[in-house]
A protein has these predicted regions:
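Hydrophobic alpha-helical transmembrane segments of multi-pass membrane transport/permease proteins
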Residues: 20-46, 60-79, 119-122, 180-185, ...
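Junction motif at the cytosolic side of a transmembrane helix
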Residues: 221-225, 236-262
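Short helix-capping/hinge motifs at transmembrane helix termini and TM-loop junctions
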Residues: 39-48, 129-137, 167-168, 192-197, ...
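Transmembrane helix boundary and interhelical loop/hinge segments in multi-pass membrane proteins
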Residues: 18, 76-101
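Transmembrane helix segments
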Residues: 30, 37-47, 164-211
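Short hydrophobic, aromatic-rich alpha-helical segments embedded in or entering the lipid bilayer
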Residues: 2-12, 190-232
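Aromatic- and glycine-rich beta-strand/loop motifs that create alpha-glucan
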Residues: 1-31
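Alpha-helical transmembrane segments and their short interhelical loops
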Residues: 103-182, 227, 231-239, 243-247
Length: 262
């Protein structure tokens, strides 16, 4: 069996297990949908608009792609961090490495699984946004949307794998992953419009990749946004974080449980 077939089988196996895991379904699918409905219902009932890149846009067109970005981080970063750390602690990663399957196929399958989950989740959220809140993709933005989804997922996965070096136990991963994701959600223009943040907090948020992923996706759906949909600075920051995460992951990833030999 070729490595490519093994990669697809590994992703399929992971997807099947993920959909059977109640906690994973709640965490990566139901939770983002609840957030989407709550934010759009609460904020759309105020004045109905917020400021985005100097123009007024309706809340639904702002929050819907923001929640998509947040779900990418939930799945690619936090979800993968927790899954890998838990499987390592149980000794499953060590067993995988002892099989003839190349190591990169296992990790690649995990990333491919996350990409598929993100695409499914993005479609669900966008359909809900379109049907319930009249949110629509900008003309000619489909290609940019695909780039942001794939690049954003790859970046978050790379960072999630890299952080497994620090989260030596499943409990630590279950605390660190959601904590980082929630904090960045507040400072990256996901939960609170960027125009409502203090300048220093906005600047802090833009250091991290979630702000650029959220802004990129928001540009894809904002009818009043100007300029190119595929913004070079957002893509560059996401790519830089992805490369940094990949380098750290390659150099520091551990297959053995805490306390085992290297």
């Amino acid at each position: 069996m070729s490595d490519a077939v093994l990669l697809l089988e590994q992703a399929r196996f992971g997807l099947r297990g993920g959909f059977r895991n109640t906690r994973a379904v709640i965490f990566t699918i139901i939770f983002p949908i609840v957030l989407l409905v709550l934010f759009n219902s609460v904020f759309s009932g105020k004045n109905g608009t917020t400021r985005f890149q100097g123009v007024r846009v309706d809340f639904a067109s702002y929050f819907t792609p923001g929640i998509v970005a947040y779900s990418i981080m939930l799945t690619g970063f936090s979800g993968l961090l927790i899954a890998l750390t838990t499987n390592r602690e149980r000794g499953l990663l060590k067993r995988y490495r002892g099989t003839p399957m190349p190591s990169w196929v296992f990790l690649g399958g995990q990333i491919l699984q996350s990409v598929v989950m993100v695409l499914i989740m993005a479609i669900v959220l966008i359909v809900i946004g379109s049907v319930a809140y009249d949110v629509h993709l900008r003309s000619g933005a489909l290609g940019a949307l695909a780039v942001y989804l794939v690049l954003g997922t790859a970046t978050m996965c790379a960072l999630g794998i890299a952080l497994t070096r620090v989260t030596t136990t499943a409990d630590a991963a279950s605390a660190v992953g959601p904590f980082v994701t929630v904090i960045l959600g507040f400072v990256s223009g996901v939960f609170i419009p960027v125009s409502s943040l203090p300048n220093w907090l906005e600047d802090l948020g833009r250091v991290f990749p979630l702000a650029h992923l959220a802004e990129g996706l928001q540009r894809c759906f904002s009818p009043a946004a100007t300029g190119n949909v595929l913004d070079g600075s957002n893509v560059a920051v996401l790519a830089a974080w992805g490369v940094a995460g990949l380098v750290i992951a390659v150099r520091t990833f551990r297959w053995d449980p805490q306390g085992a030999g290297t």
